[in-house]
C-alpha cells in the first residue's frame, strides 16, 4: 500500500512539474505556426504589388490565394482567440498567450473586404481559412484587396 501511495504521489509531482512546460510548448508551436502563415499573407501582398500589373476594375486583376491555419487546442497546440486582418497588418491573439502584429510591407494601398460592416476580417474558428488577395488600379493607386474565399 505504501509503494502505491508513493508511486501515485511521485507521478502527480512529475505531472505538476511538466504541465507548465507543456503549456509553454503549445503556445510556442501555435505562435510559430501563426507567424509563418501571416508572413505568407504579407509576402503574397508584397509580391503581388511588386511583380504584377494592376488593372482597372471591373476586370479581374492578378490574384493570390493564401491559407491561414488556426490550430485547434490539443496536446501540441494552444487555442487561438483570433486573427484580425485590417489595412495595417495581421494581428493574432493566443488564448492565455501572447499577441503580435505582422505589418504589411508594400507600397500599394491595402484594403480589406470583410463580409459584414466591420473594418477587418476576423478569424476565430479553428481550421483552414482561405484568403484571396487581388491587385487593382483604383483612383490612380495600386491597391491590394484582401477578402475571404470560404
Model-flagged regions — what are they?
Residues 13-16, 25, 57-61, 137:
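Residue-level signal for the start and early helices of compact helical domains
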Residues 36, 55, 59, 80-82:
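General "foldedness" signal
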Residues 69-150:
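Intrinsically disordered, low-complexity regions enriched in Pro/Ser/Thr/Gly and acidic residues
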Residues 39-40, 63, 116-119:
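N-terminal start-of-chain detector that recognizes signal peptides
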Residues 49-74:
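Short, glycine/small-hydrophobic-rich surface segments
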Residues 1-51:
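Hydrophobic alpha-helical segments
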Amino acid at each position: 500500500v505504501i509503494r502505491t501511495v508513493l508511486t501515485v504521489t511521485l507521478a502527480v509531482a512529475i505531472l505538476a512539474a511538466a504541465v507548465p512546460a507543456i503549456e509553454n510548448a503549445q503556445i510556442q508551436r501555435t505562435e510559430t505556426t501563426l507567424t509563418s502563415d501571416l508572413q505568407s499573407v504579407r509576402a503574397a501582398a508584397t509580391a503581388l504589388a511588386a511583380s504584377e500589373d494592376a488593372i482597372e476594375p471591373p476586370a479581374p486583376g492578378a490574384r493570390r490565394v493564401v491559407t491561414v491555419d488556426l490550430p485547434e487546442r490539443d496536446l501540441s497546440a494552444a487555442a487561438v482567440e483570433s486573427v484580425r486582418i485590417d489595412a495595417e497588418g495581421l494581428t493574432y491573439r493566443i488564448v492565455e498567450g501572447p499577441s503580435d502584429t505582422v505589418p504589411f510591407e508594400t507600397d500599394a494601398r491595402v484594403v480589406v473586404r470583410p463580409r459584414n460592416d466591420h473594418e477587418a476580417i476576423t478569424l476565430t474558428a479553428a481550421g483552414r481559412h482561405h484568403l484571396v488577395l487581388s491587385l487593382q488600379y483604383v483612383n490612380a493607386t495600386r491597391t491590394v484587396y484582401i477578402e475571404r474565399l470560404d
